[in-house]
Regions:
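Catalytic NTP-binding/metal-coordinating core of nucleotidyl cyclase/transferase enzymes
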Residues: 1-84, 88
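A generic fold-level signal
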Residues: 4-6, 57, 114-116, 139, ...
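Residue-level detector of solvent-exposed, low-hydrophobicity positions
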Residues: 26-29, 151, 193, 202-204
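C-terminal tail/extension regions appended to the core domain(s) of diverse proteins
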Residues: 169-204
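Catalytic beta-strand-to-alpha-helix segment of the class III nucleotidyl cyclase homology domain
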Residues: 69-181
Length: 204
């Protein structure tokens, strides 16, 4: 292990909801399911550009980060670009979902139930330890743990953008968002103030 550095970062996870139910047992349907999920994951990744970077793929999710300090970009640019991308993830996801629905290859369970898939995105701002293991760049630390814990929450809908107060204050969105303030609590991490945006409630 070498090249250990701590950076202030925006941490983001884009996670496909309905993935477990979608990956059904029939062999043909499993293959079609994986193809569909892969297409949707690739769609999200195609939206990623510097200052956002992909840390890793985590099954049905993409773990992203943006360093808050940069020799190339101003902080104002980073926070605005991140806000634009957080919204664009939903637009791109649903455009791809519509395309797959329109051109679905068959009537199997996977192809017939595309409407059950949705996207949830969680975001937190904090610190992360960057280190290398062989050729792999890893991130760790309390804030990395927290952003993953946020995927398990009390929100009663499948599609949303959940931000901690730190992320909400750091990110600047292109339009006014209707958000709901909430509270989550996690063992060893304590209470977390959150702001939740549901895509259909966008103002502007």
């Amino acid at each position: 292990m070498s090249n250990q550095d701590i950076h202030e970062v925006l941490l983001i996870i884009a996670d496909i909801s309905g993935y477990t139910k979608f990956m059904v047992s029939d062999d043909v349907e499993v293959k079609h399911s994986q193809h569909i999920i892969s297409e949707l994951i690739h769609t999200i990744i195609r939206q990623v550009e510097i200052p956002l970077e992909v840390s890793k793929l985590e099954g049905d999710a993409v773990f992203l980060y943006a360093k808050k300090e940069s020799d190339t970009f101003t902080w104002d640019y980073i926070r605005k670009t991140t806000g634009e991308k957080l919204i664009r993830f939903f637009d791109a996801f649903h455009n791809k979902l519509q395309e797959l629905t329109t051109h679905r290859s068959c009537g199997c369970g996977a192809c017939s139930n595309l409407h059950e898939l949705s996207l949830k995105v969680v975001a937190h701002s904090g610190e992360a330890l960057f280190y290398n293991i062989h050729d792999f760049k890893e991130l760790s630390g309390k804030d990395v743990i927290l952003v993953h814990r946020l995927l398990k929450n009390s929100i009663n809908t499948d599609e949303y953008l959940l931000m901690t107060q730190q992320a909400y204050e750091d990110v600047e969105f292109p339009d006014l968002l209707a958000t709901e303030e909430g509270k989550e609590s996690y063992s060893h991490l304590g209470p977390v103030t959150t702001y939740v945006y549901k895509p259909e409630s966008r103002l502007g």
